[in-house]
Amino acid sequence: NPQGKRVVLFGAGGAARAVAVELALAGAESFHIVNRSVERGQALVELLRHKTLAKAELVAWLGPYRIPADVDIVVNATSIGLFPDVDATLDLDLDTLRPELVVADGIHNPPLTHLLRTAQSRGCRTVDGLGMLVNQGVIGVEYWTGRTPNAQVMRESLLALKL
């Protein structure tokens, strides 16, 4: 439940915008938008400030990012770590991943990214990118067929592929 939570969001593209707006509408209190492009990052900050009640600030990503002590949720909405470049890692100070954090990665292939493996090893609760992929698929199938597919079956089928 994102109600009242403070979020660090890596990225400012389409996936980041969707995640940020949904978290804000669900009650997230504030966002640190961490992005290399100041212009794109600031556009997301302005969107959040003008369309939601959440506070938002842009943080320039100039080196290993340290997760602030007051943050509750960390989300990677970049393509860093996406197949085939699965060994790529966020420029993140991994020592700042604390057990009480929820760490989510929008990447669906591989489902268990370097970020998520590291977060799990540090006791964090993790959320993989398959959920976003599956829910996009559910919406697409509903749109085209008028029928609602079983999201759990879709997720299990994707996992069975062992991508």
Features from the language model and the residues they span:
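Glycine-rich adenosine-cofactor-binding loop
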Residues: 4-24
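NAD(P)-binding Rossmann-fold cofactor-contacting core
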Residues: 26-52
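Conserved S-adenosyl-L-methionine
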Residues: 25-30, 121-125
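Rossmann-like adenosine-cofactor binding region
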Residues: 54-126
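Short, flexible coil/linker segments at domain boundaries that flank nucleotide/cofactor-interacting
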Residues: 1-3, 26, 97-98
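Adenosine-phosphate binding glycine-rich loop
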Residues: 4, 100-102, 106-163
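Hydrophobic Val/Ile/Leu positions in short beta-strands of Rossmann-like dinucleotide-binding domains
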Residues: 9-10, 33, 105
